[in-house]
């Protein structure tokens, strides 16, 4: 279980959120909401261990993540708002790099899940923004991490792709995994199982 305890985040002397606390357990899908500038990306980076809060701490299974970095890196997958893939490599080469323990068959299957069959050997820099995003999202079919932290994973993805990715989120949660995401897109109607946390300058405003 992930526990955020009394997190405060400030940028350029402006408090983005203060005393923010919540938990994310096995099987949870949590959407972080809020207006632009509320600190959604900053929160995800703090949760992933890429930034430090002004105060507060992150616990994973009741232990501070800073005390178990190696375990945390295995248990957590972070995908930022940029695709985060290597433009000079192909989709196949990217996934081999990020998931060296996976077979080519597994990688081809993952690329098929995100509709990139036929693009395995293309240069990523020559793909569209949506295709580059899907190369990154193919990692969701390969990762063994229990917690996924995803910043705008649905950007440049069409409606059918959104539904498939949300289905993968649900499958991951059904296996006891957890998902934390931000998105500006409306989620499919059937995804009423998604918990929502809304950020304001005072921290968590609403959670349901």
Curated annotation (Swiss-Prot):
Positions with a binding annotation for ATP: 34-41
Q: Which gene is this protein's source?
A: ccmA
Subcellular location(s) per record: Cell inner membrane
Membrane topology summary: Peripheral membrane protein
Q: Which reaction does it catalyse?
A: heme b(in) + ATP + H2O = heme b(out) + ADP + phosphate + H(+)
Q: Which GO terms describe its molecular function?
A: ABC-type heme transporter activity; ATP binding; ATP hydrolysis activity
Q: What is its EC number?
A: 7.6.2.5
Q: Does the keyword Nucleotide-binding apply?
A: yes
Q: What is this protein called?
A: Cytochrome c biogenesis ATP-binding export protein CcmA
Can you name a GO cellular component term? plasma membrane
Q: Output the SUPFAM superfamilies linked to this UniProt entry.
A: P-loop containing nucleoside triphosphate hydrolases (SSF52540)
Cite the InterPro entries for this sequence.
AAA+_ATPase, ABC_transporter-like_ATP-bd, ABC_transporter-like_CS, ABC_transptr_haem_export_CcmA, P-loop_NTPase
Q: Which UniProt keywords apply?
A: ATP-binding, Cell inner membrane, Cell membrane, Cytochrome c-type biogenesis, Membrane, Nucleotide-binding, Translocase, Transport
List the SMART domains: AAA
């Amino acid at each position: 279980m992930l526990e955020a305890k009394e997190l405060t985040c400030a940028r350029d002397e402006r408090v983005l959120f203060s005393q923010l606390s919540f938990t994310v357990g096995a099987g949870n899908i949590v959407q972080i909401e809020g207006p632009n500038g509320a600190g959604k990306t900053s929160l995800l980076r703090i949760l992933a261990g890429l930034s430090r809060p002004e105060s507060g701490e992150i616990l994973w299974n009741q232990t501070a993540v800073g005390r178990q970095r190696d375990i945390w890196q295995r248990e957590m997958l972070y995908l930022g708002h940029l695709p985060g893939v290597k433009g000079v490599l192909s989709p196949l080469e990217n996934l081999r790099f990020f998931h060296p323990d996976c077979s080519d068959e597994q990688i081809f299957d993952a690329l098929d899940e995100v509709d990139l069959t036929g693009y395995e050997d293309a240069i990523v820099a020559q793909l569209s923004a949506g295709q580059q995003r899907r190369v990154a999202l193919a990692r969701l079919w390969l990762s063994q991490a229990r917690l996924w932290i995803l910043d705008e994973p649905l950007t440049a993805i069409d409606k059918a792709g959104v539904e498939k990715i949300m289905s993968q989120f649900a499958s991951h949660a059904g296996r006891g995994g957890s998902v934390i995401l931000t998105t500006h897109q409306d989620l499919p109607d059937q995804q009423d199982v998604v918990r929502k946390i809304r950020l304001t300058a005072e921290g968590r405003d609403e959670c349901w």
